[in-house]
A protein has these predicted regions:
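Active-site neighborhoods and metal-handling regions in enzymes and metal-associated proteins
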Residues: 1-306
Length: 306
């Protein structure tokens, strides 16, 4: 029988700390409930609160003095949520999700209360709530919840470190397997085994190939072509290996069949200089302005940022 402990989980203490932070936010903002929405890979708020990596649309309702509730789609995703979620009241949202949300608000006696909203709630749902419950006061607390989440816990940092290790291993596999004649769209087969063998998955693997002497695309592309790598090409990459809701990221440029041209080498040296300067500046207490000022080395070397 499947159980929660068969999957990567956060400790009970970690989850309790998160839930307590939500209730403190509700008290601070003077709301009676918090309705959190997420869908697919854009459901990190739901994941953070439930320890279940939501797969389709889902709503989580927190309410002072009552246990939280999850409404989710689809019906065949319901059994997995029941196993993994630390929130025990998990419900299928039925044939009409919006109607189920309205029913939950009514069931919980929130039809004339203050409800905070987190996430990009579909306009149709927001409109129905506002029309059905004109006495309810809705306010957007997305930014405040996410600002609270920006300070990572030790358990979260452990996951980020492991995801970053998977990312490093994938880039090493890429370096060892690239060769002229490969298609762009088959390169992912070099990358993903590093994640999959360790219980991870691909966050992103954006890539663009082009002749070094005639570059024609400014960024790693989100969709891969069937173009074949050739001697004298550059392959620019943006790779993220992920593990249970957290990912690393690495950018690397590869030259195919020969070393980098003088211009590519010069550009790489400028990027390395910027990285080394930034790595010294970015620390506890640093501001984004300070980081941007440190990155000005790119402009001083004659380049622009895209």
């Amino acid at each position: 029988m499947r159980q929660r402990f068969d999957y990567p989980i956060f400790s009970d203490r970690e989850i309790a700390t998160r839930h307590q932070a939500v209730y403190q936010l509700m008290e601070q903002e003077n709301v009676d409930a918090l309705l959190i929405y997420g869908a697919g890979r854009y459901a990190s708020d739901v994941y953070w609160l439930s320890d279940w990596p939501s797969s389709r649309e889902a709503y989580v309702l927190f309410q002072t003095g009552k246990e939280p509730v999850i409404l989710l789609q689809l019906f065949n995703h319901f059994p997995m949520a029941k196993v993994m979620s630390v929130i025990k009241d998990v419900r299928w949202a039925g044939a009409n999700t919006t109607s189920s949300v309205l029913d939950l608000i009514r069931e919980r006696g929130l039809d004339s209360k203050k409800i905070g909203i987190v996430g990009s709630l579909p306009y149709q749902v927001y409109l129905r709530i506002a029309e059905k419950f004109p006495g309810a006061a809705l306010s957007d607390l997305s930014g405040k919840l996410r600002m609270m989440r920006t300070i990572r816990s030790p358990e979260e940092i452990d996951r980020i470190r492991f995801a970053s290790k998977l990312t490093d291993e994938s880039i090493q596999a890429l370096a060892g397997g690239l060769k002229a004649g490969m298609r762009e769209d088959e390169i992912a087969a070099l990358i993903e085994p590093a994640y999959l063998k360790r219980g991870g998955y691909a966050g992103i693997h954006f890539m663009s190939s082009m002749p070094m002497r005639e570059p024609d695309f400014p960024v790693p592309s989100q969709f891969h072509s069937n173009r074949k790598l050739q001697k004298g090409d550059a392959l620019i990459t943006e790779i993220s290996g992920a593990y249970s809701g957290y990912s690393g990221q690495i950018h690397r440029t590869f030259s195919i069949g020969e070393g980098p041209t003088a211009e590519w080498k010069k550009m790489h040296d400028a990027a390395m200089e910027a990285f080394e300067v930034l790595s010294k500046v970015i620390k506890d207490g640093a501001t984004t302005t300070e980081a941007e000022e440190a990155a000005e080395v790119i402009h001083r070397r004659g380049y622009s940022t895209y």
